[in-house]
């Protein structure tokens, strides 16, 4: 079925920054996708095209990316007349049209919007939900797997004030019998945590960060973990709900010294207290011994390969590469060869097309890795990643706290999918790392 119209516009993300929305029109109607954007972005990600005109939106406008869709990509793709169901061919065409290795000419934000909207058009043409179409594209088996929602309930690092260096503390309801029960448990713990934070740190501690987590003025990881442990206990889920962290350590790596500064938000930080990667690894291990930590993301800086391999050899929980791998096939291949981590954080806007995202997941699965599908800190009401998580059988999704509509949009979409699939779906639960084999 041919595409009759492709139109892009500039809309706003959850941080009030412009982002790209794309409409693809076929005989089945209008199919729309909105592209997200990240706050802490990896060096090796594809290029998110921003206008750089400081007189508008502080230079963050996306009018050039929008223009590239409307004037270049749209007309060319319509003329090419590729079947929307042939996602690989569509994405290959988009990449060739751009012609750069990092999508820097047309912008990954322009290309991704088109890629995702085309997938929605294809699902409509087949008369199936988006997750089922993605499952077909990826060749995943049945039954469908509903992911464990990793809920970012406490924020630090670049996402919050306070001195806390680690960026995200997540609760992981992996012993719940179903997705909806897991989400309920998470929501209940979140409410307890919010009340506790206000009681201990004052009313403003209930204020939420970019991803819906609370951001009290916490100094250390232990303090954060104690607070979360107490909230889990008060909600009645001790021993049932686990914890995951996204350290985002590239943000506090001192490259010249090859050390990590846990006091990086303090301009007067004391260099004698900076940690070597071995010391930081020991800190993680001591935390994992004391708290029910099942997953650590970006424990080391994105190019500190030696540290990753050292840590991988000596720990048994999930080690997730985000800044390390940036959903990039070459970086994933290197991480597999160097035995750096054992799970991929999949962000579609780091690689820029649906086909390449599916391939990144397949490459990771092939080496026995887990795959966690992820939102970005600048999100929208678009719920495509919920369908991607289910379609790929990823078994884990990270999409913020059970707060703020742009986060809940994804979680609510999975609730709908759960209801629709009924007995034809299983909850990944404690097998979230190997859900693709369920």
Swiss-Prot record:
Q: Which InterPro entries match?
A: Enolase (IPR000941), Enolase-like_C_sf (IPR036849), Enolase-like_N (IPR029017), Enolase_C (IPR020810), Enolase_CS (IPR020809), Enolase_N (IPR020811)
Cofactor names from the entry are: Mg(2+)
Query: Where Mg(2+) is bound, by residue?
Result: 246, 297, 322
According to UniProt, the reaction catalysed is: (2R)-2-phosphoglycerate = phosphoenolpyruvate + H2O
Q: Could you tell me the EC number(s) of this protein?
A: 4.2.1.11
Q: Name one GO cellular component term.
A: phosphopyruvate hydratase complex
This protein is called what? Enolase
Give the taxonomic lineage as stored in the record.
Answer: Eukaryota, Fungi, Dikarya, Ascomycota, Pezizomycotina
Gene this chain is encoded by: enoA
């Amino acid at each position: 079925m041919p595409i009759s119209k492709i139109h892009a516009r500039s809309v706003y993300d959850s941080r009030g920054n412009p982002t790209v929305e794309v409409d693809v029109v076929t005989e089945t109607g209008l199919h729309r996708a909105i592209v997200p954007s990240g706050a802490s972005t990896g060096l090796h990600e594809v290029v998110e095209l921003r206008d750089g005109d400081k007189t508008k939106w502080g230079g963050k406008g996306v009018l050039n990316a929008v223009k590239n869709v409307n004037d270049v990509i749209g007309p060319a793709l319509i003329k090419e007349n590729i079947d929307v169901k042939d996602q690989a061919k569509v994405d290959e065409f988009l990449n060739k049209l751009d012609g750069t290795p990092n999508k820097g000419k047309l912008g990954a934000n322009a290309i991704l919007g088109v890629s995702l909207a085309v997938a929605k058009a294809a699902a409509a043409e087949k008369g199936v939900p988006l997750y089922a179409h993605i499952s077909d594209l990826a060749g995943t088996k049945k039954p469908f797997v509903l992911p464990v929602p990793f809920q970012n309930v406490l924020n630090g690092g670049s996402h919050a004030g306070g001195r806390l260096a680690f960026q995200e503390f997540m609760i992981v309801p992996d012993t719940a019998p179903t997705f909806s029960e897991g989400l309920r448990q998470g929501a209940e713990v979140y409410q307890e945590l919010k009340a506790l934070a206000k009681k201990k740190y004052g009313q403003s501690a209930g204020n939420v960060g970019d991803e819906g987590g609370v951001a009290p003025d916490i100094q250390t990881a232990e303090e954060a973990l104690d607070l979360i442990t107490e909230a889990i206990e008060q909600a009645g889920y001790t021993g049932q709900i686990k914890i995951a962290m996204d350290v985002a350590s590239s943000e506090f790596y001192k490259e010249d010294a090859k050390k990590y500064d846990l006091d990086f938000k303090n301009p007067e930080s004391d260099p004698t207290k900076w940690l070597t990667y071995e010391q930081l690894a020991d800190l993680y291990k001591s935390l994992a011994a004391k708290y029910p930590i099942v997953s650590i993301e970006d424990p080391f800086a994105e190019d500190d390969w030696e540290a990753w391999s050292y840590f991988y050899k000596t720990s048994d929980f999930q080690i997730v590469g985000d800044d390390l791998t940036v959903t990039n096939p070459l970086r994933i291949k290197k991480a597999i060869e160097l035995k750096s981590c054992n799970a991929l954080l999949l962000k579609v806007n780091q690689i820029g097309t649906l086909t390449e995202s599916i391939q990144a997941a397949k490459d990771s699965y092939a080496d026995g890795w887990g795959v966690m599908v992820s939102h970005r800190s600048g999100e929208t009401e678009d719920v495509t990643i919920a369908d991607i998580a289910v379609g790929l059988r990823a078994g884990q999704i990270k999409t913020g706290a059970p707060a703020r509509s742009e986060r809940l949009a994804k979680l609510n979409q999975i609730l709908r999918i759960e209801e629709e699939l009924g007995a034809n779906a299983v909850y990944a639960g404690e097998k979230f790392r190997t859900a693709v084999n369920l």
